[in-house]
Amino acid sequence: MSNKVKSDIEIASKAEILPVTTIAKHLGLDADALELYGKYKAKLSYDTIHSLKDQEPGKLVLVTAINPTPAGEGKSTVTVGLGDALSKKDKKTVIALREPSLGPTMGIKGGATGGGYAQVIPMEDINLHFTGDFHAITAANNALSAFIDNHMQQGNELGIDGRRIVWKRVVDLNDRALRKVVVGLGGPVQGVPREDGFDITVASEIMAIICLASDLKDLKKRLSEIVIGYNYKKEPITVGEMGYEGALTLLLKDALKPNLVQTLEHTPAIVHGGPFANIAHGCNSVSATSTALRLGDYVVTEAGFGADLGAEKFLDIKVPALGKAPDCVVIVATIRALKMHGGALKTELSEENVEALAKGFTNLQKHTESIQTFGIPYVVAINKFITDSDAEVAKLEALCEEHGIPFSLTEVWEKGGDGGLELADKVIAAVESGEADYNRIYDDAWSMEEKLEAIVTKVYGGIGVELSSKAQKQIVEFKKYGWDRYPICMAKTQYSLSDDPTLLGRPTDFVIHIREFIPKLGAGFVVALTGDVMTMPGLPKKPAALNMDVDENGNAQGLF
């Protein structure tokens, strides 16, 4: 390998990419099972998905992580590299990932196709517009907003109270200027003036619905159950009452179909859906994971950010919908993130600091304990970076051994599947041990307060919950409507176990502050907004987009 570090886009652009029909053959599917989007991308048809439903599912491996740095810790990279490594171990493997959002792609974190020699391709297409799923979701979401405003303009038969509309418009970009807007200005013929706002598309309830719906019938039912706001009697109003679930389903009928692509090493990858884990449930679609489980012996999937967010939601929200719990969990840890949790400055994470690493190790410990609470065996993947010193690697390995934490030093970014062979061996051993005994940490019949308490104490390590006066009133209201039976989806900072992004490591004796609840009945959960978390991110001072370009031949530059 050359000493020069190649960029992700350089590696991906020079890769040998097979026709997606060839990838489908590896899974036992012929060309008729696909709806082609060019030569290298395809959607799986409804007939194909339905034909697989009665097949026995394979083994499921969930990849999660410790609390990350702003740049991310390579969870997607490890997911892809582990999938390739399992393929090299002669396991029929399928990778199931979320689709990237243009917000972080253009912002600071970059895309979500992995990195180095562990990527899904065509990465340029996937990181930009892919098969148009996010655009369809954006269109459906904003169509509903248009229907709401038109209903109010055309007589307002349902008595929608414009002050109590909870449905927001969306765009798949980080755009802080759109968080609060006023619509309907310009006089009587321009609409009814009201306050509105934009979320990022991945925070839309329709995104969550796409990712949790089992089929078109279920999609339509879930869309009809969306609460758009309240009438003047303070009663909830749903899409079903407005009568637009059919039109929304029509807009989304193709977006519900999972997308098939491949890794650099030609392992099949089903990439579909993309809710964030800090402001939504953070998992790819049930349809994609379920289909992958029936096509492969091993399925490697991921859940966003740390185990306190994506993994908790995967295990408490997605697993009941999927009907299958993971057989093993992989927790991705990096030396740079552990140093940050140990007090090292963000500007100094590339410098050797064994002391900070040892201090930050407690963050990893907490996440291993949380996964054990769910009754699932785990392996820690130490995702090696080129800036990691030998002394730091040795210290982290020694700490894992000292505390009985199973681990593997993973170098898939540099070596592809070959860099994850030991991790694959340990994952196979964990899966075949049969030790998985899934325990959900709360029951849907529990009160909202009890569910919140379970998440905060068992997963975050906090001591309790503090509800704002608004949240307290909402709990009374939600009980009245029977909404308290839904799972809780916490909207919380990804950087800390607490709701304070500056409280790193393993904080104790903290409470989680709930400022507001948002009913997402179509998705089938209630969102609890904590701290200052935003559902529309902003751009950094120097967005990644500054380094992006396209040459005269149409080749992308600067994507990662």
From Swiss-Prot:
Keyword Nucleus: no
One Pfam family linked to the record: FTHFS
Enzyme class: ligase
Biological-process GO terms, alphabetical: tetrahydrofolate interconversion
EC number: 6.3.4.3
GO molecular function, one term: formate-tetrahydrofolate ligase activity
Keywords noted in UniProt: ATP-binding, Ligase, Nucleotide-binding, One-carbon metabolism
Pathway connected to this protein: One-carbon metabolism; tetrahydrofolate interconversion
SUPFAM superfamilies according to UniProt: P-loop containing nucleoside triphosphate hydrolases (SSF52540)
Positions annotated to bind ATP: T69, P70, A71, G72, E73, G74, K75, S76
Protein family (similarity comment): Belongs to the formate--tetrahydrofolate ligase family.
This protein's name: Formate--tetrahydrofolate ligase
Name of the gene encoding the protein in the UniProt record: fhs
